[in-house]
Amino acid sequence: MEESDFSASAYDQVYDAPRPEIFFKSLPEKAVGPHEAVGIRKDAHWNVPEPELALIINAQGSIVGHTIGNDMSSRDIEGENLLYLPQAKMYDRSCSLGPWIVLGSDDATVRSWSIGVTITRSEEMVFSGDTSISQIKRSFQELADYLFRSQRFAHGAVLMTGTGVVPNDDFTLEQGDVVTIDISGIGSLTNPVIRV
């Protein structure tokens, strides 16, 4: 399984573009918490978790905390056509957040954290990977500022910062898998996987 050449080149370009890639991920009712099941689409064949740092932003656009996010993605749908990205990213149980919000951490501290993911299937580890939050190119406040341009969030927003760890192209999640994402300064977010 692979993404189209156009999709791959479009993603490469965004890292050096003046404007960051920001798009709408989820309504609150599409997200789940710790130990609740995340979903894989029944009409997709290549589904992966995307472990991400999540910024908790108040209604004024200021970052007030951090948590762990899992941006579930149907890579075959996304790779077929970039215009299908909303279908690949936003569906029931396509996002998990938790286990809690860490308040008061400055950017230098947050950038020192590591992020990792493990996936188990029938109690056997089938994937693990990790990276450092310091690999995020843009400043966290720049991302928040772009999100709040020309729009308001009366109750604030959660902004997931993108992933640096994804399983190999020959891997897909299966119903019954368990995904655990760890961020060193926050803790662990664990979710079983179901088909939706």
Give the location of each predicted region.
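Active-site microenvironments in enzyme catalytic cores
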Residues: M1-E123
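Catalytic-pocket segment enriched in acidic/His residues
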Residues: S73-V196
